[in-house]
Amino acid sequence: MNKIVGFDIGENSVKMAYFVGRELKRTAKLELPDAMVSGGRILSMDAMADFLHDAAKGSGIPLTNAALVVPASEVYTRIITLPAMTEQQLFYNLPYEFRDFLTEEKSKYFFDYAVRRIVNDETGHPKEMELFACAILKTTVEGYRAMLHRAGFRLRVL
């Protein structure tokens, strides 16, 4: 059985949902103390880690694997259409679709995608791919990973 706790950290509250497999076991919504989050950014990762640890324990939510909703301000997202290509070609080309938005070198980002649809030609062969693509700084991911680790969780999903 896979156990995971989902976190949604907002401006004023933290929402937690604990799942065992596909079954929702427990939820909690706790108000954040003042000055924890501003403009979608956590002001002190250490203070947030301590809050999450105490909030989970107080709500009967175990310290286990974690999934985190990342604020829109921390991730670049795009809907893109590309010619049909292999996964290897896609991972090579994906960073170039964000070149006008990234503030750092492409090597400092994680890139991912989900296929929204495949457009086939008249013979039924893939012609184009419509993707939901995203990019996030590796340092941002590491900051969240370290925060959750300090709180007693293991980041598995962003």
Q: What do these predicted regions represent?
A:
Residues 70-158:
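Active-site neighborhood for divalent-cation/phosphate handling
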Residues 18-21, 55, 113, 154:
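Solvent-exposed, well-ordered amphipathic alpha-helical segments
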Residues 27-57:
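N-terminal phosphate-binding loop and adjacent alpha-helix
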Residues 22, 57-61, 104:
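Short helix-loop boundary/capping segments at the starts of domains
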Residues 1-34, 62-71:
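Gly/Thr-rich phosphate-binding beta-strand-loop-beta motif of the actin/hexokinase/Hsp70
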Residues 2-3, 38-42, 104-105, 151-152:
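N-terminal start-of-chain detector that recognizes signal peptides
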